[in-house]
Amino acid sequence: MKCPFCGYDNLPGADQCEQCLSSLTQDDIPQADSGVERSLMEDPVACLQPIRPLTVDTHTSMAEALELMRNHHIGCLLITAEQGALAGIMTERDLLQKVALEAPPLEQCRVEDFMSAAPETSKPDHPLGYALQRMIVSDLRYLPLVDDSGRPNGIVSSRDIIAYIAKNLI
């Protein structure tokens, strides 16, 4: 049975999702009352057509990271470790809360010193509602999408979800 919360394909008859531990009993599965709710529960994150993320490795200098963000007009960078696996995320919020307060020499600092390590992630085939729930619970503006190996392959922003909901309401 496919979990309506995270999209994981569980064994038939399972009472609880092996991935997210949500109940799979019919009484606990929410039912959609509107087309928007149905879309959030059934449409995959991939329907947002997430953009390819800009990535840097953990040893990139903060000066270089800031320049990339400014030149590409983006609000975040995904930070990768060896083998390309996602190690963290550097957002505008990180810059304001961590870097701006300390005002270190940016050429000498590395992104790994200021990134948010081990960020929440989703996969392109997860239900949109699951991604939205992760963003709300964790107070995120950006949600990295990863493949089965943990390598980033997309990013979804709160603006993407708002645009999707607005489009489906009209």
Protein language model regions, located:
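Tandem CBS (Cystathionine beta-synthase) repeat/Bateman regulatory domains
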Residues: M1-I170
